Amino acid sequence: MLYNSTQNAAEVVSAAQAIAQGISKDGGLFVPQEFPKYSAETFNELLKLDYKGRAKKVFADFLSDFTEEEINDCVENAYTKEKFGSDNPAPLAYAKLNGKELNILELWHGPTCAFKA
């Protein structure tokens, strides 16, 4: 999969280049040229997996220049109980607001207390 800069679509890089570079030369962010399309069947299969399993599947689709082994190693080393305080890096919390049930995905766990992939 290839990635373009949000500031200049002519700047095209691989996933590995986008990760290593971080931000494009023109200050833009890298975004995929295309997004994988998931069927209902694929979504149902993802539901059967834990967080790490889902991450491995999605990363494999977006990071096509990495091997399965590289992705597995990265996921296993990134989402550890020691780093997140739990085996589930992004737990769901449940709440009610004005009589409506809400599902809240907690993305602040982990060393950065910020966004998770």
Per-region residue spans from a language model:
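PLP-dependent amino-acid enzyme catalytic core
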Residues: 1-117
